[in-house]
Amino acid sequence: MSGLEKKFATKSKIVNYIINRESTSKVEISKELNLSMPTVLSNVKDLLEKGIIIEIGEYESTGGRKAKSIGINPSYRYAMGIVITANHLGMVLVNLKYEIVKSERIRLKFVSDMSYCSQVADFATKFLDHMNDAEQKEKLLGVGISIPGIINQEQKLVIKSHALKLENYSLSFLEQAFSVPVYFSNDANAAMMAEDMNTYQNAIYLS
């Protein structure tokens, strides 16, 4: 691993730690991630300057300067989720704290041709109308699309879906509807991922 890759990995590790907590401190990050204080200070400074994290208060002091508490900036980036069913289209926008910013459910019958793709693209555009094109490119991390059935994520393929009456069906037409990365998932897997994955080491999702 090159020096640049190591720096990126360290920064990602710090961001992942912060994003899964209401608040934390530089001392806590150093201790929990086994990183030196100079490394933590330099990374936190950079993350604050970029607006990825924010100062959200101060810890009680037993003497000396009060330590600043820091947390993720929820509005730094967003992700969009789309749920496709036989008769409906669901859309949701979440921030970096996994909070739902906006949601909508529309009656839309699934059909396996390009007209459906155009309709999904139109509804998604209207759903994101509070963001201009530049904001969408900068702030939208990607789109996750949930589909009932057996999905091959790498090939962007529905192997089989009883609900949508599909078999070996390419999802590339849906991917082309967006200018950001698109990820496909089985509906049950997507629902499980939407839960707080950091609360439990092992979990079972029943639908």
PLM features: what roles do these ranges have?
Residues 103-132, 136-202:
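Glycine-rich phosphate-binding loop and adjoining helix at the ATP-binding site
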